């Protein structure tokens, strides 16, 4: 019987050594150590041996059983370590490889400027108003003292729909609508997209504008100048040098255009138009110009963005080139 035990042990050693998976290893355990396994059958036959041999044979069977179990445990540990190493090798990160770049979105520079302008004017006590981009001729022109023969009302400068509908050429109509609703005194800005038939290095058919309006009983041109100086100083985060030039706008009188001095180029650059609200505009809204006065101003947000970010071509903001937009 000892020979049978030795042969069984050698067979088990070979089977365990050849096993390449935990599943096969479990099959070997059942084949040798299970209830109907080979070693279990030998153990049953010990009872048929002479009484004086039974203790020695029983001890030999148990030792072989223990040795086979140790072989199975050692092989199981080896297979688990091998499986783990293979998994780690597949997941291994080569730290010398160039990392992946995540393309993150960002706020458009025009939107940044718009948010900054809104924030600053809110701090100065202005309410923020919005209105429709598709307007009629009354709100876009007539209420603002722009007569029918004014050049701005021609097909060459304005985008018209059928009837008297058009794409607004400025955000001034918002001011008219708000004065109709709220009356006076009033202090507001209107931001949004406006449209004109123009395209070159400093103009686009669609651009962004902020217009401000103050109507009260003691509004003066000096108030207007002080407000614009304070706003532009805050926006550019430095003291800026302004120049007011006489100009003409149908809805303001007197009117002026405002230039900012550029020390780097030693030049003046126009940034906005402004003036005292024309008495006819007040009369159109049943406001007595002898009792109330006011001032208005209009600033191109795109022009402010050009100055703030030192961009030379306005069209770059609208070409959706991520190489350009990613700089802001």
Swiss-Prot record:
Mg(2+) binds at residue 253. Binds 2 magnesium ions per tetramer. PROSITE patterns: AA_TRNA_LIGASE_II (PS50862). SUPFAM superfamilies: Class II aaRS and biotin synthetases, tRNA-binding arm. InterPro entries: aa-tRNA-synth_II (IPR006195), aa-tRNA-synth_II/BPL/LPL (IPR045864), Phe-tRNA-synth_IIc_asu (IPR004529), Phe-tRNA_ligase_II_N (IPR004188), Phe_tRNA_ligase_alpha1_bac (IPR022911), Phenylalanyl-tRNA_Synthase (IPR002319), tRNA-bd_arm (IPR010978). Its cofactor is Mg(2+). One of its GO terms (molecular function) is ATP binding. GO terms for cellular component: cytoplasm. GO terms for biological process: phenylalanyl-tRNA aminoacylation. Its main location: cytoplasm. It is found in: Cytoplasm. Keywords: Aminoacyl-tRNA synthetase, ATP-binding, Cytoplasm, Ligase, Magnesium, Metal-binding, Nucleotide-binding, Protein biosynthesis. It catalyses: tRNA(Phe) + L-phenylalanine + ATP = L-phenylalanyl-tRNA(Phe) + AMP + diphosphate + H(+). Its EC number is 6.1.1.20. PANTHER family: PHENYLALANINE--TRNA LIGASE, MITOCHONDRIAL, PHENYLALANYL-TRNA SYNTHETASE. Belongs to the class-II aminoacyl-tRNA synthetase family. Phe-tRNA synthetase alpha subunit type 1 subfamily. Tetramer of two alpha and two beta subunits. This is Phenylalanine--tRNA ligase alpha subunit. It comes from Coxiella burnetii (strain RSA 493 / Nine Mile phase I).
